[in-house]
Amino acid sequence: VLEKHNLPKALVTVVPNPDRALMQELMEQRDYIDVIIPRGGEGLINYVTDNAKVPVIQHFKGVCHLYVDKDANLDKAMALLLNGKTQRTGVCNALEGLVVHQAVAGDFLPKVAEAFKEKGVKVHVNEKGSQYFDGADVISEDAYGEEYLGLEIAIRVVDDFEAAVDHIAQFGSNHTEVICTEDAEKGKLFQRAVDASVVMVNASSRFSDGSQLGLGAEIGIATTKLHAY
Protein backbone atom coordinates (compact mmCIF):
# COMPACT_ATOMS: atom_id res chain seq x y z
CA VAL A 1 0.00 0.00 0.00
CA LEU A 2 2.81 2.41 0.84
CA GLU A 3 4.58 1.76 -2.45
CA LYS A 4 1.32 2.21 -4.33
CA HIS A 5 1.14 5.74 -2.97
CA ASN A 6 4.86 6.44 -3.53
CA LEU A 7 5.71 6.34 0.16
CA PRO A 8 8.80 4.66 1.65
CA LYS A 9 8.25 1.22 3.14
CA ALA A 10 10.23 2.28 6.21
CA LEU A 11 7.27 4.37 7.35
CA VAL A 12 5.95 1.20 8.99
CA THR A 13 8.31 -0.89 11.07
CA VAL A 14 7.48 -4.08 12.95
CA VAL A 15 9.35 -5.09 16.10
CA PRO A 16 9.25 -8.90 15.88
CA ASN A 17 10.42 -9.62 19.43
CA PRO A 18 7.60 -9.20 22.00
CA ASP A 19 10.02 -9.12 24.96
CA ARG A 20 8.69 -6.55 27.45
CA ALA A 21 12.23 -5.38 28.24
CA LEU A 22 12.58 -4.23 24.63
CA MET A 23 9.22 -2.51 24.85
CA GLN A 24 10.37 -0.69 27.98
CA GLU A 25 13.49 0.54 26.20
CA LEU A 26 11.40 1.66 23.23
CA MET A 27 9.06 3.63 25.50
CA GLU A 28 12.01 5.64 26.82
CA GLN A 29 13.25 6.91 23.43
CA ARG A 30 12.06 10.51 23.69
CA ASP A 31 14.60 11.68 21.11
CA TYR A 32 13.26 9.34 18.44
CA ILE A 33 9.58 8.71 19.20
CA ASP A 34 6.96 11.44 19.30
CA VAL A 35 3.97 9.53 20.63
CA ILE A 36 2.90 6.02 21.63
CA ILE A 37 -0.59 4.66 21.00
CA PRO A 38 -0.81 1.29 22.78
CA ARG A 39 -3.19 -1.24 21.28
CA GLY A 40 -4.10 -4.27 23.35
CA GLY A 41 -5.59 -5.36 26.63
CA GLU A 42 -6.14 -3.22 29.70
CA GLY A 43 -3.01 -4.61 31.39
CA LEU A 44 -0.79 -3.58 28.49
CA ILE A 45 -2.32 -0.13 28.30
CA ASN A 46 -1.87 0.43 32.03
CA TYR A 47 1.74 -0.74 31.81
CA VAL A 48 2.55 1.64 28.95
CA THR A 49 0.80 4.56 30.63
CA ASP A 50 2.62 3.99 33.92
CA ASN A 51 6.08 3.40 32.46
CA ALA A 52 6.47 5.37 29.24
CA LYS A 53 8.64 8.49 29.05
CA VAL A 54 7.26 9.23 25.59
CA PRO A 55 3.83 10.92 25.39
CA VAL A 56 1.00 8.37 25.27
CA ILE A 57 -2.41 8.61 23.61
CA GLN A 58 -4.28 6.35 25.95
CA HIS A 59 -7.35 4.37 25.04
CA PHE A 60 -9.48 2.10 27.14
CA LYS A 61 -12.73 0.23 26.91
CA GLY A 62 -15.97 1.49 25.44
CA VAL A 63 -18.77 1.12 27.99
CA CYS A 64 -21.60 2.92 26.18
CA HIS A 65 -25.11 3.41 27.54
CA LEU A 66 -28.56 4.08 26.15
CA TYR A 67 -30.83 5.95 28.55
CA VAL A 68 -34.55 5.61 27.78
CA ASP A 69 -36.24 8.64 29.28
CA LYS A 70 -39.84 8.84 30.48
CA ASP A 71 -40.65 10.89 27.36
CA ALA A 72 -39.03 8.46 24.93
CA ASN A 73 -40.62 7.07 21.80
CA LEU A 74 -40.36 3.40 22.73
CA ASP A 75 -40.29 2.13 19.14
CA LYS A 76 -37.36 4.44 18.50
CA ALA A 77 -35.72 3.31 21.73
CA MET A 78 -36.01 -0.33 20.67
CA ALA A 79 -34.42 0.41 17.30
CA LEU A 80 -31.52 2.22 18.99
CA LEU A 81 -31.08 -0.60 21.48
CA LEU A 82 -31.04 -3.44 18.98
CA ASN A 83 -28.76 -1.61 16.56
CA GLY A 84 -26.39 -0.54 19.32
CA LYS A 85 -26.26 -3.93 21.06
CA THR A 86 -26.70 -6.61 18.42
CA GLN A 87 -25.51 -5.29 15.05
CA ARG A 88 -21.85 -5.82 15.93
CA THR A 89 -20.98 -6.71 19.49
CA GLY A 90 -17.18 -6.71 19.56
CA VAL A 91 -16.64 -3.00 18.94
CA CYS A 92 -16.07 -0.06 21.25
CA ASN A 93 -19.23 1.78 20.17
CA ALA A 94 -21.58 -1.10 20.92
CA LEU A 95 -23.98 -0.64 23.83
CA GLU A 96 -22.96 -2.32 27.07
CA GLY A 97 -25.54 -0.68 29.34
CA LEU A 98 -29.25 0.16 29.21
CA VAL A 99 -30.74 2.63 31.69
CA VAL A 100 -34.54 2.92 31.78
CA HIS A 101 -36.75 5.44 33.57
CA GLN A 102 -39.16 3.62 35.86
CA ALA A 103 -42.14 5.41 34.27
CA VAL A 104 -41.67 3.46 31.01
CA ALA A 105 -40.07 0.28 32.34
CA GLY A 106 -43.37 -1.61 32.46
CA ASP A 107 -44.11 -0.89 28.80
CA PHE A 108 -40.59 -1.12 27.43
CA LEU A 109 -38.75 -3.89 29.24
CA PRO A 110 -41.14 -6.78 28.45
CA LYS A 111 -40.58 -5.97 24.77
CA VAL A 112 -36.83 -5.82 25.41
CA ALA A 113 -36.98 -9.22 27.10
CA GLU A 114 -38.75 -10.71 24.08
CA ALA A 115 -36.34 -9.15 21.59
CA PHE A 116 -33.26 -10.16 23.57
CA LYS A 117 -34.52 -13.72 23.91
CA GLU A 118 -34.84 -13.89 20.13
CA LYS A 119 -31.36 -12.40 19.65
CA GLY A 120 -29.73 -14.50 22.37
CA VAL A 121 -28.68 -11.55 24.54
CA LYS A 122 -27.82 -12.38 28.16
CA VAL A 123 -29.27 -9.85 30.59
CA HIS A 124 -27.84 -8.59 33.88
CA VAL A 125 -30.42 -6.38 35.59
CA ASN A 126 -31.00 -4.69 38.93
CA GLU A 127 -33.68 -5.91 41.34
CA LYS A 128 -36.15 -3.25 40.23
CA GLY A 129 -36.03 -4.45 36.64
CA SER A 130 -35.70 -8.19 37.22
CA GLN A 131 -39.48 -8.78 37.22
CA TYR A 132 -39.53 -8.22 33.46
CA PHE A 133 -36.97 -10.91 32.59
CA ASP A 134 -37.27 -14.66 33.08
CA GLY A 135 -34.05 -16.14 34.42
CA ALA A 136 -32.05 -12.92 34.20
CA ASP A 137 -28.99 -12.45 36.36
CA VAL A 138 -29.70 -9.95 39.16
CA ILE A 139 -26.62 -7.77 39.00
CA SER A 140 -24.59 -6.53 41.94
CA GLU A 141 -23.60 -2.88 42.11
CA ASP A 142 -19.91 -3.56 41.52
CA ALA A 143 -20.64 -5.59 38.38
CA TYR A 144 -21.79 -2.58 36.38
CA GLY A 145 -19.28 -0.99 34.00
CA GLU A 146 -18.29 -4.23 32.30
CA GLU A 147 -17.31 -4.20 28.63
CA TYR A 148 -18.87 -7.47 27.48
CA LEU A 149 -17.96 -7.31 23.77
CA GLY A 150 -20.62 -9.93 23.18
CA LEU A 151 -24.33 -10.62 23.44
CA GLU A 152 -24.62 -9.44 27.05
CA ILE A 153 -25.90 -6.21 28.57
CA ALA A 154 -26.29 -4.62 31.99
CA ILE A 155 -29.67 -2.98 32.66
CA ARG A 156 -30.73 -0.58 35.39
CA VAL A 157 -34.19 0.81 36.08
CA VAL A 158 -33.84 4.24 37.70
CA ASP A 159 -36.18 6.58 39.52
CA ASP A 160 -35.45 9.71 37.51
CA PHE A 161 -33.23 11.53 35.02
CA GLU A 162 -30.68 12.51 37.67
CA ALA A 163 -30.21 8.87 38.72
CA ALA A 164 -29.58 7.92 35.10
CA VAL A 165 -26.90 10.60 34.73
CA ASP A 166 -25.31 9.50 38.00
CA HIS A 167 -25.20 5.89 36.83
CA ILE A 168 -23.53 6.84 33.56
CA ALA A 169 -21.02 9.06 35.37
CA GLN A 170 -20.08 6.19 37.68
CA PHE A 171 -19.97 3.31 35.21
CA GLY A 172 -19.43 4.81 31.75
CA SER A 173 -16.02 5.05 30.10
CA ASN A 174 -16.47 8.55 28.59
CA HIS A 175 -16.78 7.04 25.12
CA THR A 176 -20.35 7.39 23.82
CA GLU A 177 -23.63 7.97 25.67
CA VAL A 178 -27.13 8.13 24.19
CA ILE A 179 -30.50 9.42 25.38
CA CYS A 180 -33.80 8.52 23.76
CA THR A 181 -36.35 11.24 24.47
CA GLU A 182 -38.93 13.35 22.68
CA ASP A 183 -38.27 16.22 25.10
CA ALA A 184 -35.79 18.48 23.30
CA GLU A 185 -34.84 20.31 26.48
CA LYS A 186 -34.14 17.02 28.24
CA GLY A 187 -31.89 16.03 25.36
CA LYS A 188 -29.92 19.26 25.66
CA LEU A 189 -29.66 18.80 29.42
CA PHE A 190 -28.31 15.27 28.91
CA GLN A 191 -25.68 16.58 26.51
CA ARG A 192 -24.54 19.12 29.08
CA ALA A 193 -24.68 16.75 32.05
CA VAL A 194 -22.92 13.70 30.60
CA ASP A 195 -19.14 13.61 30.19
CA ALA A 196 -18.22 11.60 27.09
CA SER A 197 -16.45 12.06 23.78
CA VAL A 198 -19.75 11.68 21.94
CA VAL A 199 -23.17 12.40 23.47
CA MET A 200 -26.14 11.61 21.25
CA VAL A 201 -29.87 12.30 21.25
CA ASN A 202 -32.05 9.72 19.47
CA ALA A 203 -29.16 8.22 17.49
CA SER A 204 -27.39 4.88 17.63
CA SER A 205 -24.13 4.61 19.52
CA ARG A 206 -22.79 2.87 16.41
CA PHE A 207 -22.54 6.28 14.71
CA SER A 208 -19.67 7.10 17.08
CA ASP A 209 -17.03 6.49 14.46
CA GLY A 210 -14.29 8.66 13.02
CA SER A 211 -15.47 8.18 9.46
CA GLN A 212 -19.17 8.59 10.24
CA LEU A 213 -18.54 11.84 12.10
CA GLY A 214 -16.16 13.18 9.47
CA LEU A 215 -13.25 13.30 11.91
CA GLY A 216 -10.85 11.08 10.00
CA ALA A 217 -9.15 7.80 10.76
CA GLU A 218 -9.45 6.13 14.14
CA ILE A 219 -6.38 5.21 16.14
CA GLY A 220 -6.49 2.56 18.83
CA ILE A 221 -9.85 1.59 20.28
CA ALA A 222 -11.23 4.49 22.27
CA THR A 223 -8.88 7.45 22.43
CA THR A 224 -11.03 9.35 24.93
CA LYS A 225 -11.48 12.92 23.70
CA LEU A 226 -8.94 12.94 20.89
CA HIS A 227 -12.06 12.54 18.75
CA ALA A 228 -14.82 14.52 20.49
CA TYR A 229 -18.12 15.44 18.89
Question: Residue locations for each model-derived region?
Answer:
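Rossmann-like NAD(P) dinucleotide-binding subdomain of oxidoreductase/dehydrogenase enzymes
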Residues: 1-71
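Structural motif
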Residues: 10-13, 34-35, 54-57, 65-66, ...
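Short loop/edge segments at beta-strand edges and connector loops
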Residues: 16, 125-127, 159
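General structural feature for long, well-ordered alpha-helical segments within catalytic domains
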Residues: 22, 29-32, 40-44, 59, ...
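Short, surface-exposed amphipathic charged segments that create phosphate/polyanion-binding patches used
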Residues: 27-31, 73, 136-143, 214-218
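ALDH superfamily catalytic-core signature
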Residues: 44-150, 201
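Conserved C-terminal structural/oligomerization subdomain of aldehyde/semialdehyde dehydrogenase
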Residues: 140-229
